[in-house]
Amino acid sequence: MERSHKTEGGKAVRREAVFQPEFREDLRHWVEIDRKIALRALTIVEAVLRDPFAGIGKPKPLKYLAPGMWSRRLTQEHRIVYLVGDDRIDFLQARYHY
């Protein structure tokens, strides 16, 4: 899955979405336990692909873990964690609080 968004210079940046095994397992968990949370996770994924640094879920850089790592609030307890690269966004987890 690829999406593009505009940067400050107006140039479109395309990034590929890469879903790591832990993220896929977390998403399966939410489908079984609470489908509303699973749908919210997918909505957040779409928002991240549009703009990884702004939008729903209160994006927050995780500067102490790794450069380019961000989180967004899925529920009060759980976060989606993703890593933004030049040409891809790795979705790492969708459960727990980093």
Segments (PLM) and residue ranges:
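Solvent-exposed, amphipathic alpha-helical segments
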Residues: 44-48
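Generic structural signal for secondary-structure transition and capping sites
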Residues: 50-53, 67
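Enriched for short, Lys/Arg-rich terminal
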Residues: 1-16, 24-43, 56, 62, ...
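Glycine-rich, flexible loop/turn motifs
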Residues: 49, 58
